[in-house]
Design a protein with these regions (language model features):
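General marker for long, soluble alpha-helical cores
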Residues: 1-114
Length: 114
């Protein structure tokens, strides 16, 4: 049986989160978004925010769901997703931020040319 928000918030897992992160998870729940994506305690606040924003705009946040990504990598991936690109192949934390930005820039350049 899937866990409800009410049972999760009372669980030991929820106790791992500070108030700011709990509020973000609650906002996702209140917006009928998949709040369970945000319950990975390895995400920092900025990473959670990038995932939450992606979900808020009805985009698939799965390419961002790697806690080893930096905040900046997540932000670039989110921008790519918002532009309609499949960013799944680029969610490798070993891709440097500058290289990831170059990939995003090239995708945007190709989009404008077509």
């Amino acid at each position: 049986m899937p866990q409800t928000f009410d049972t999760w918030i009372k669980s030991d897992r929820a106790q791992q989160f500070d108030l700011i992160r709990l509020k973000m998870i609650k906002k996702a729940y209140d917006a009928n978004l998949d709040w369970t994506i945000l319950t990975n305690p390895k995400y920092n606040i900025k990473q959670m925010h990038e995932i939450w924003i992606t979900m808020l705009y009805n985009n698939n946040p799965r390419p961002l769901c790697n806690p080893k990504l930096t905040d900046q990598q997540m932000r670039i991936l989110r921008k790519g997703i918002e532009e309609g690109f499949d960013m799944s192949p680029y969610n490798d934390p070993n891709i440097e931020q500058t290289q990831l930005f170059e990939i995003f820039s090239n995708l945007m350049k190709n989009k404008k040319e077509n």
